Amino acid sequence: MIEYLILTCLAISVTFNMLGSIALHRFPDVYTRLHGATKCTTFGTIFATFAVVIFALARLNETRNPKYLQMALHSLIALLALLLTNPVGAHAIARASHLSGYLPKRAVVDAYLERRREKDE
């Protein structure tokens, strides 16, 4: 039963990571590509980490070997680091793109540019 849960988590992970890869190729500009890739790969990595944690806790229950608890905790710490750094990195890339003059393809309103102009005046 645990194996099916692990395989389901891995299947969801692979699906979302593939969708993120497709987003990199299909979307028109850096902002939509960044959005698609960041959201999909974050969600995919969450499920991959859940699969590792479930595996480690199942093995811990079977063997009582503390290295599996360590593996589960390290996986959760890595997941926490990803959840903190992935959005920050995406924001930094988007901001750098905007500051370098690469604007969205179909932007109607650019509030960030308007605020920057007001600040400069």
UniProtKB/Swiss-Prot annotation:
It holds the Pfam family PhaG_MnhG_YufB. It comes from the Archaea. InterPro entries: PhaG_MnhG_YufB. Coiled coil: none annotated. One of its GO terms (molecular function) is sodium:proton antiporter activity. Transmembrane segments: none annotated. Belongs to the UPF0091 family. This is UPF0091 protein PH1428. It comes from Pyrococcus horikoshii (strain ATCC 700860 / DSM 12428 / JCM 9974 / NBRC 100139 / OT-3).
